Amino acid sequence: MLFRSQPNTEIYIIGHTDSTGTDAINNPLSVARANSVRDYLAVRGADTRLIRTEGRGSREPIASNATDSGRAANRRVEIFLAERAVAQR
């Protein structure tokens, strides 16, 4: 997997929900969604010290919440990879 061959890569995982339900439900759900992906990667050898998770609830839809397909698209996790800066001496 990528994280084994790229030890200086940080992984950012962001969970999202659709707009069904309240923020009190969606915000923790989006965090749990991101943490689930983190746990999946950890079991497969990812260094959890290099993984950051965040939940954004329903605040950043990529599709309309007025349709089933739009709501399904909004229930997602995004993964971003970034090379960690290495201090030079």
Report the location of each language-model feature.
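Short, small-residue-biased leader/transition segments that mark boundaries at the very start
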Residues: 1-2
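Short phosphate-binding/catalytic loops that engage adenosine nucleotides
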Residues: 6-9, 46
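Amphipathic, soluble alpha-helical interaction motifs
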Residues: 5-6, 40
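Periplasmic OmpA-like peptidoglycan-binding domain that tethers envelope proteins to the cell wall
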Residues: 14-89
